[in-house]
Amino acid sequence: PQTGYDDTRALIAEWHGRGRLHYAVTPRFAITSSPEQLEMAGQLMREFPDLHMQTHLSENHAEIAYTQELYPWSQDYTDIYAHYGLLGPKALFGHCIHLSEREADVLSDSGSVAVFCPTSNLFLGSGLFDYHRYRRRAKPLRIAAASDVGGGTNYSMLRTMDEGYKVIALQGEKLNPFASFWQITLGNARALSLEGRIGTLDAGSDADMVVLDARATPAMALRMETVSALAEELFLLQTLGDDRAVREVYVAGRAAIPS
């Protein structure tokens, strides 16, 4: 643990705040972390309060049960991270599928973020993230949408929200395409506490933009022949679009992919 702590401090000094880079403290999850490692992760968050912290929470029932065996003193999975000082507005918890009401309240009260990883959750059969319930509850959760680098099947946010739509539909709800595109732009920026820099086209924001082509493939072009509203075009991009629909990318106003 001490070596990991020292190495992390060195990486923070080297990279955090360099240009647009942000360092995230990343304990893999409670199962693979010793109490000493989690304690030192919490210490880093206290020493560097502007850092993000990302880890894994309540993905499947077997994982939850095993975690409780390893930390029998805890009320629940979330209580472990709370005990070590790893909750807060900069804390991002992947999955969060099987949260109890108490856990959801704790995450909400602390401002922590539940990260929706639909391609991973469907691929692994982990369960269905209750997006609308988490947003509508008396103590709503902050939510991000992500690919999950480990279990996800695609890095595209279009594909991510297409699978997210299916997860929500399996629970008898729908996700409006405007809500989908809000989630992967300003919604995710807010989840990262970076809405002052990214996520909008407001004056003063970094000019990070993606130009999408709703006629990128023959199937999309055919479907566009009957599209008459922006919501339909966005839904088409979400359900049929992928990396082929990306025409141009601008990072801080500079073209990353030639037009």
Residue ranges and their predicted role:
Residues 1-94:
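Metal-coordinating catalytic core of metallo-dependent amide/deamination hydrolases
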Residues 25, 41, 56, 81, ...:
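Conserved, mostly hydrophobic/aromatic
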Residues 29-31, 57-63, 97-99, 118-122, ...:
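Active-site-proximal loop/turn and secondary-structure-junction residues that shape catalytic pockets
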Residues 53-54, 92-94, 115, 144-146, ...:
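Structural detector of well-ordered beta-strand residues that form the stable sheet scaffold
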Residues 206-259:
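C-terminal cap of metal-dependent C-N hydrolases
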